[in-house]
């Protein structure tokens, strides 16, 4: 029986969009991006998919990508099918319009995974590039009651166990846990494979599975966020430039040293 691998993926604002393109809706406390800028798949989640595909390259495995969100673009998410995933499941609902926090996201993911059935390995990106919270994988592993290993650089499955080479401040360490398990994958894994034209065309013919919250047995009362966002704003910065003048380089240097000492920089 093939190894059942689930990869979680998030659709995010393109991190390459310039700051000047953003605005903030003060009433809803939401980031507003012009429609000309398309969203992308979170880069760390592409690393997670690459880890899954490397396992699939060496043994029989089925890779299912699971995404939760609002206004998910099927065309954007199809890239993951083109990369080599076998199936794509999207969970989106009007109940998500008001925003769901990390806890609710993890609960929705857990419900969707239980609906999918038995699994061997869940791979998640180490964090999302929009908020950088890195909370969902840890909440998800708690909800499912499986062991978790974070910050993977290399993932290998053998004999009912997953061996993970993970990144730590001192270098690398190897951790091994029994399956089923959840592993978060870091960008140190390497560059994800690029979809071929043939794979992209094949992915365009594949239909994702689309579920609503009710399909997972969830209602509005279970989707209320625990986190209250008090304010959201673009940081402001003030730059002051002062030209130091003098009769020569030595005088300018002395004045510069005095200024730096006054500012307690030296």
Where are the regions a protein language model picked out?
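N-terminal glycine-rich FAD/FM-binding segment characteristic of electron-transfer flavoproteins
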Residues: 1-266
């Amino acid at each position: 029986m093939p190894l059942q691998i689930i990869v979680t993926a998030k659709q995010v604002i393109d991190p390459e969009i310039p700051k000047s393109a953003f605005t903030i809706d003060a009433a809803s406390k939401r980031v507003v991006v012009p429609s000309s800028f398309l969203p992308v798949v979170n880069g760390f989640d592409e690393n997670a998919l690459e880890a899954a595909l490397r396992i699939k390259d060496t043994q029989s495995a089925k890779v299912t990508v699971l995404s939760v969100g609002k206004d998910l673009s099927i065309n954007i998410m199809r890239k993951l099918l083109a990369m080599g995933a076998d199936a794509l499941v999207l969970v989106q609902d009007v109940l998500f319009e008001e925003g769901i926090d990390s806890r609710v996201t993890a609960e929705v993911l857990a419900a969707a995974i239980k609906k999918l059935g038995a699994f061997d390995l869940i791979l998640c990106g180490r964090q999302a590039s929009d908020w950088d919270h890195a909370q969902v994988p840890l909440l998800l592993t708690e909800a499912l009651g499986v062991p978790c290993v974070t910050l993977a650089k290399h993932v290998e499955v053998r004999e009912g166990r997953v061996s993970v080479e993970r990144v730590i401040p001192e270098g690398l360490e190897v951790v091994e846990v029994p399956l089923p398990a959840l592993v978060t994958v870091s960008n140190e894994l390497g560059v994800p494979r690029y979809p071929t034209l043939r794979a992209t065309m094949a992915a365009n013919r594949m239909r994702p599975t689309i579920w609503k919250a009710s399909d997972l047995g969830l209602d509005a009362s279970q989707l209320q966020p625990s986190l209250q966002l008090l304010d959201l704003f673009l940081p402001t910065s003030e730059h002051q430039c002062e030209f130091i003048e003098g009769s020569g380089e030595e005088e300018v240097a002395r004045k510069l040293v005095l200024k730096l000492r006054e500012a307690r920089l030296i």
